[in-house]
């Protein structure tokens, strides 16, 4: 391995990481309880502001990552026809559009958001691990996967705080959809492995878009009394 080439690649990854951190600086600046704080109170409005910004931040790079992977690895392979309705979260009954979401009680929609976010904790962890092992995987894809995993954790934490304020005392069972796709990400057969990545990124883009829409609807209902 060429030390100079490795140094350049490392510098590029560091630059991309710094750029990504800068882009989500606005989210970091919103009020949130510091680690270990006792009796820290953050308003429901501030919590929703942060959650909506995080969900948008997650959806945007999710779309970019899918598009980049599609262009680099999936052209001419017919993956899109196989990816339809094959997401691990399909077992969760999620509204497909705004009109359907408006028919759901806010309690149920809040819990649904929690379930979808929890369903992505494990696959996002393994996505980062497996992208690292891909030969010639672009640094941009790895960086986006790392950031999305981190922000999904933050969003889940924020949603738990929101549910705690909207329905204090209620504890929703940690229900989520189990992901069993790791063996496919590690397959020796290239087509099988690439489709597993493609499908996971396709589902991530889909679900992050849904979460983004659900949170905007919930914020409108609970913060602005549906006057938006």
UniProtKB/Swiss-Prot annotation:
Pfam families registered for this protein in UniProt: Hormone_1
Phosphoserine PTM sites in chain numbering: 55, 63, 119
Listed CDD domains: prolactin_like
Domain of life the protein comes from: Eukaryota
GO cellular component, one term: extracellular space
Disulfide bridge partners, by residue number: 33-40, 87-203, 220-228
GO MF term list: hormone activity; prolactin receptor binding
UniProt main location, coarse: secreted
Keyword annotations from UniProtKB, A to Z: Disulfide bond, Hormone, Lactation, Phosphoprotein, Secreted, Signal
Compartment list: Secreted
Biological process per Gene Ontology, one example term: cell surface receptor signaling pathway
PROSITE patterns: SOMATOTROPIN_1 (PS00266), SOMATOTROPIN_2 (PS00338)
PANTHER family: PROLACTIN, SOMATOTROPIN,PROLACTIN
Function: Prolactin acts primarily on the mammary gland by promoting lactation.
Similarity comment: family membership: Belongs to the somatotropin/prolactin family.
Official protein name in the record: Prolactin
Species assigned in the record: Monodelphis domestica
